[in-house]
């Protein structure tokens, strides 16, 4: 009896674990290390609608809290700010900020915007967002050239910090 129980437990665990990792209906996940103007690469997870007959806006969240789950076959349980957004057909993008989790560079807590940059390679949160959106528009084929940024708490800080010298797509 205990062998049967063990076999059923193993089968059930493996079956439901594999089901939990299936792709999000209607989306394909890509991962990229996006180069910033100073050469630092930021880890980015991109969820693209499978329907390529339309062009979609980009909805970006930059976070110090991890954009896990990592791996192109591992999908977030929910895309966007809440479940209502999942049927709205955005290209959802999540990015680990500098020095956090899978991204390169040094993390600087609540870094202020730099009004005057000493060189074209000097960065702040606004320039990292700009470079990210520039890369996404150039490399994700079915985008419509528009982007939005959102966040609550620390990701909300990153959304606000992206506004000085913002990318024109925002």
Identify the role of each PLM range:
Residues 22-54:
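N-terminal cap/lid segment of alpha/beta-hydrolase-fold proteins
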Residues 52-58, 68, 134-170:
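Primarily recognizes the serine-hydrolase "nucleophile elbow" in alpha/beta-hydrolase
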Residues 33, 61, 146:
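Conserved beta-strand positions that form and line the central face of beta-propeller blades
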Residues 1-23:
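Bacterial Sec-dependent N-terminal signal peptides
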Residues 44-47, 62, 95, 150-152:
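Generic beta-strand/beta-sheet core signal
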Residues 39, 99, 151, 155:
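Conserved G/P- and acidic residue-centered "switch" motifs that form tight phosphate/ATP-binding loops
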Residues 55-138:
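Cap/lid segment of the alpha/beta-hydrolase catalytic domain
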Residues 46, 77-80, 156-161:
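Short alpha-helical segments and helix-capping/turn motifs at coil-helix boundaries
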